[in-house]
């Protein structure tokens, strides 16, 4: 642990979520002082406390009620912090009776307010945002580029999902999510090019995050990762959608994702957009792994033809010295183990019968 880490104050928005709760645990283990924001529910409070308990951390985390649909509520949590992790994502727009016309509009407005609050704090050195790699589709945009159908040769940080391009299994609901994440990330990155930025902004478009959780239930993305084994058709349909959108299935273990966030915090200086995914397999690579691991199970398989999985042009985080601990197989295997522990998968059915394993 850095001897000065206890003097560093960090704000984590969305501290009750999948990534937020795990990040809080990691920060406490390193001795940082953490402010966590959450919505005003008892369930969120219990989730936010789960990370420190499971991680063995004894520190008490100050919890601040805040809502992205009322971004001014984040000011008390940001006050006095040197680093701010933007992990929270707006949702439930219709139910919230929001003044905004869309989730994307709400997300951009929230980003602007939070950036202003960070400036007014006079203490914030860096804002680090958990973006989504779904905003970086390498689909070719015929209108903009004059090229044909299909994918670019590589996926890179210069890619932005062309929302005018159709693809197999496209979802109007997911389009809203992509648009909100895309617009808010672009708004954040534009801050670096301002006249006199008061701090640095980093965005990490994450792959499908899986592997483990400190929550008491399996997060949605982990459910997607194990869907070929669980045979949950809706979750598996999402995997197929990602394959169509991205040309591959970018994966990252939650522990690696949080280590990457910490890496970006602890560097002397860093700004810009950096992908965070340890592997870019195809959906067939994933189902083949599960079929090999569990030969006695009827693993769901995609019927769509897939060419070569689109790979990243460069590993920008890797060039800075970051290394992933978990590859594709470790991510998938630990996801299955976690889902079984939490009851989302029947652990008894996962055991390979002797008659099969001895062949």
Curated annotation (Swiss-Prot):
Function according to Swiss-Prot or TrEMBL: In tandem with Hm1, NADPH-dependent HC toxin reductase (HCTR), which inactivates HC toxin, a cyclic tetrapeptide produced by the fungus Cochliobolus carbonum to permit infection and acting as an inhibitor of host histone deacetylases (HDACs), thus conferring resistance against C.carbonum race 1 in resistant cultivars (e.g. cv. B73 and cv. Wisconsin 22). Catalyzes the production of 8-hydroxy derivative of HC-toxin via the reduction of the 8-keto group of 2-amino-9,10-epoxy-8-oxo-decanoic acid, an amino acid of the HC-toxin.
Known EC number: 1.3.1.-
Residues at which NADP(+) binds: 39, 67-68, 87-89, 177, 181, 206-209, 221
* Keywords carried by this UniProt record: NADP, Oxidoreductase, Plant defense
* Active site residues per record: 181 (proton donor)
| Name of this chain's protein | NADPH HC-toxin reductase 2
Which family is annotated?
Belongs to the NAD(P)-dependent epimerase/dehydratase family.
Primary enzyme class: oxidoreductase
Provide the GO biological process annotations: defense response to fungus; toxin catabolic process
Keyword GTP-binding among UniProt keywords: no
Highest taxon above the source species: Eukaryota
Primary gene name? Hm2
Q: Name one Pfam family in it.
A: Epimerase
Which InterPro entries did the record assign?
Epimerase_deHydtase, NAD(P)-bd_dom_sf, NAD(P)_dehydrat-like
Miscellaneous note, as given in the UniProt record, is:
Plants susceptible (e.g. cv. Pr, cv. K41, cv. K44 and cv. K61) to the fungus Cochliobolus carbonum race 1 contain a transposon insertion (Drone) in Hm1 and a deletion in Hm2 due to a loss of resistance. However, the compatible cultivar Missouri 21A (cv. MO21A) possesses other defects in Hm1 and Hm2 alleles coming from different mutational events.
Q: Mind listing the GO molecular function terms for this protein? A: aldo-keto reductase (NADPH) activity; oxidoreductase activity
* Species of origin: Zea mays (Maize)
């Amino acid at each position: 642990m850095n001897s000065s880490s206890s003097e560093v104050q960090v704000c984590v928005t969305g501290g009750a979520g999948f990534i937020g709760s795990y990040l809080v645990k990691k920060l406490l283990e390193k001795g940082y002082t953490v402010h966590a924001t959450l919505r005003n529910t008892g369930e969120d409070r219990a989730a936010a406390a789960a990370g420190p308990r499971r991680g063995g951390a004894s520190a008490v985390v100050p919890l601040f009620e805040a809502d992205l649909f009322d971004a001014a509520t984040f000011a008390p949590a940001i006050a006095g912090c040197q680093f701010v992790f933007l992990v929270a994502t707006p949702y439930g727009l219709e139910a919230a009776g929001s003044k905004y016309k869309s989730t994307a509009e709400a997300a951009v407005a929230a980003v602007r307010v939070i950036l202003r609050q960070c400036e007014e704090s006079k203490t914030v050195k860096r804002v680090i945002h958990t973006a989504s790699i779904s905003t970086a589709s390498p689909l070719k945009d015929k209108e903009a580029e004059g090229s044909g159908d299909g994918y670019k040769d590589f996926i890179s940080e210069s890619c932005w999902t062309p929302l005018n391009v159709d693809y197999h299994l496209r979802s109007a609901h997911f389009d809203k999510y992509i648009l909100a994440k895309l617009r808010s990330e672009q708004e954040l990155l534009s801050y670096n090019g301002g006249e006199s930025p008061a701090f640095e902004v980093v965005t990490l478009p994450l792959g499908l995050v899986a592997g483990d959780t400190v929550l008491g239930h399996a997060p949605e993305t982990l459910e997607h990762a194990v869907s070929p084994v669980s045979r949950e058709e809706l979750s598996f349909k999402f995997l197929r959608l990602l394959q169509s959108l991205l040309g591959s299935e970018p994966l990252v273990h939650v522990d690696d994702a949080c280590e990457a966030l910490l890496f970006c915090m602890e560097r002397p200086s860093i700004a810009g957009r950096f992908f965070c995914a340890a592997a870019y397999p195809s959906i067939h690579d994933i189902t083949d792994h599960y079929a090999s691991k569990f030969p006695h199970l009827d693993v769901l398989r995609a019927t769509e033809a897939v060419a070569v999985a689109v790979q990243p042009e460069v590993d920008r985080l890797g060039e800075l010295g970051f290394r992933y601990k978990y590859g594709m197989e470790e991510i998938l295997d630990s996801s299955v183990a976690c889902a079984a522990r939490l009851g989302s998968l029947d652990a008894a059915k996962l055991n390979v019968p002797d008659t099969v394993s001895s062949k």
